From Swiss-Prot:
Lineage: Eukaryota, Fungi, Dikarya, Ascomycota, Saccharomycotina
N-terminal signal peptide: none
SUPFAM superfamilies registered for this protein in UniProt: UBC-like
Origin species: Kluyveromyces lactis (strain ATCC 8585 / CBS 2359 / DSM 70799 / NBRC 1267 / NRRL Y-1140 / WM37) (Yeast)
Designated name of the protein: Ubiquitin-conjugating enzyme E2 2
Reaction it catalyzes: S-ubiquitinyl-[E1 ubiquitin-activating enzyme]-L-cysteine + [E2 ubiquitin-conjugating enzyme]-L-cysteine = [E1 ubiquitin-activating enzyme]-L-cysteine + S-ubiquitinyl-[E2 ubiquitin-conjugating enzyme]-L-cysteine
UniProt pathway annotation: Protein modification; protein ubiquitination
Keyword vocabulary terms for this entry: ATP-binding, Chromatin regulator, Cytoplasm, DNA damage, DNA repair, Nucleotide-binding, Nucleus, Sporulation, Transcription, Transcription regulation, Transferase, Ubl conjugation pathway
Family stated for the protein in its record: Belongs to the ubiquitin-conjugating enzyme family.
Occurrences of domain UBC core (ranges): 4-150
EC number: 2.3.2.23
Compartment annotation: Cytoplasm; Nucleus
Length: 164
């Protein structure tokens, strides 16, 4: 069934395929355009550099008038990410407008890697380390980057087994 939300998501998908912003990728599940898997590559010159962080985006029929539910599936140590992977980002809450699309959502999340907002912490420990003990913060982030690589290797091994 074609609805305004589904048509808009197909346009978002076309844009992601044709002109994906650097360091982000996303696509809907093969059997459900309302649920997307996404990945953000940690930006250069940040502690997250080269990490591969997976996310899940869940849309409902009110999209684009209502933001999707977005959460990290990958482990994330960041001042604005809750332990369950949910993200504290104004455009996913009170500053949402229908002009945002999947690409702009992901680039906004990616920008948090460069510029965390410790004034609005979802993870108090990460915010405190970011503000007061930067070297410890960087060490913890780099541990999650390495974990993201390990998770990717496990996923690739699982895919290889599925193909056999």
């Amino acid at each position: 069934m074609s609805t305004p939300a589904r048509r808009r998501l197909m346009r978002d998908f076309k844009r992601m395929k044709e002109d994906s912003p650097p360091g982000v990728s996303a696509s809907p599940l093969p059997d459900n355009v309302m649920i997307w898997n996404a990945m953000i590559i940690g930006p250069a010159d940040t502690p997250y550099e080269d990490g591969t962080f997976r996310l899940l985006l869940e849309f409902d029929e009110e999209y684009p008038n209502k933001p999707p539910h977005v959460k990290f599936l990958s482990e994330m140590f960041h001042p604005n990410v809750y332990a369950n992977g949910e993200i504290c980002l104004d455009i996913l809450q009170n500053r949402w407008t229908p002009t945002y699309d999947v690409a702009s959502i992901l680039t906004s999340i990616q920008s948090l890697f460069n510029d965390p907002n410790p004034a609005s912490p979802a993870n108090v420990e990460a915010a405190t380390l970011f503000q007061d003990h930067k070297s410890q913060y960087v060490k913890r982030v780099k541990e999650t980057v390495e974990k993201s690589w390990e998770d990717d290797m496990e996923d690739m091994a699982d895919e290889d087994e599925d193909e056999e």
